[in-house]
């Protein structure tokens, strides 16, 4: 990226990376997930550093995820919490570290640690909808694992908020009300007016996606709090999972 092309730009938001759950986690796919995030971010950070003396962007909002925290049970996690263990934690640490050239050049760098984004056309919800719509949905495993979610509306608004407000470092992009997988399944079934009583044993998804993906994406418990957003006065459009799912699926507020 030619640094001159960045002159006059005030801020850059960079979220690119291969889909986490698009394919089975083979060794090559895991390497693709990592490198698609770190290499592009490193190149962008270097270009931003070179552009800064020329009048380039002052702000970089770079992608990350709550996978940074790993499987933590019922522990309440804030931006100050230490990293967890596992592949996704390793990816997030490397992804955030890839911005260091921009940080050293004096840009304000903020990392968007995003949770489960509720979108009908992509992500976890898009994969669950077909099962739940025909009455085959239910909790995964024990169902006690926490899911930290955010509506797509709030995700976009939070990214804009990170540009406009003087925040640097990690920012948890999740709604304040994390729920268990059982609660999520019941609420989704209610919104769709379908039963959600069929528990899904981990073996089924593991055969399709691989045990590593299932363990870290479906069975891991991550109870994350949006401390920076809430402390900075960010106004969530959706505090209720039911309300967020209704708007996402039916296109209108609850």
Over which residues does each language-model region extend?
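NAD(P)H-binding glycine-rich loop region in Rossmannoid oxidoreductase-like domains
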Residues: 1-39
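Conserved Rossmann-fold NAD(P)-dependent oxidoreductase catalytic core, especially the SDR/UDP-sugar
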Residues: 30-32, 41-86
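Conserved beta-loop-beta element that borders a ligand/cofactor-binding pocket
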Residues: 64-65, 97-120
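Glycine-rich "substrate-gating" loop/helix at the edge of Rossmann-like oxidoreductase active sites
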Residues: 83-88, 115-122, 142-150
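Alpha-helical substrate-binding/gating segment
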Residues: 100, 129-137, 145-179
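Mid/C-terminal beta-alpha module of Rossmann-like enzyme folds, strongest
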Residues: 158, 164-212, 246-254
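C-terminal amphipathic/interface module of NAD(P)-dependent oxidoreductases
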Residues: 216-254
């Amino acid at each position: 990226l030619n640094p001159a092309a960045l002159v006059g730009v005030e801020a850059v938001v960079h979220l690119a990376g291969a889909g986490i759950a698009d394919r089975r986690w083979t060794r090559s796919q895991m390497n693709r997930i990592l490198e698609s995030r770190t290499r592009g971010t490193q190149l962008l950070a270097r270009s931003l550093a070179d552009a800064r003396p020329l009048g380039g962007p002052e702000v970089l909002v770079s992608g990350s995820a709550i996978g940074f925290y790993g499987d933590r049970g019922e522990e309440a996690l804030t931006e100050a919490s230490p990293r967890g263990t596992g592949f996704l934690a390793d990816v997030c640490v490397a992804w955030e570290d890839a911005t260091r050239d921009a940080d050293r050049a004096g840009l304000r760098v903020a990392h968007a640690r995003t949770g489960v984004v509720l979108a009908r056309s992509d992500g976890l919800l898009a994969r669950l909808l077909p099962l739940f719509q025909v009455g085959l949905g239910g909790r995964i495993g024990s169902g006690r694992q926490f899911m930290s979610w955010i509506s797509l509306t709030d995700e976009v608004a939070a990214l804009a908020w990170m540009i406009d407000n003087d925040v640097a470092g990690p920012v948890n992009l999740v709604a304040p009300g994390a729920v268990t997988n059982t609660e999520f399944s019941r609420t989704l079934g209610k919104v769709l007016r379908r039963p959600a009583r069929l528990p899904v044993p981990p073996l089924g998804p593991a055969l399709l996606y691989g045990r590593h993906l299932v363990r870290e994406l479906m069975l891991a418990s991550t109870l994350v709090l949006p401390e920076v957003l809430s402390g900075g006065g960010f106004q969530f459009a959706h505090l209720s999972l039911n309300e967020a799912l209704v708007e996402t699926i039916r296109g209108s507020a609850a």
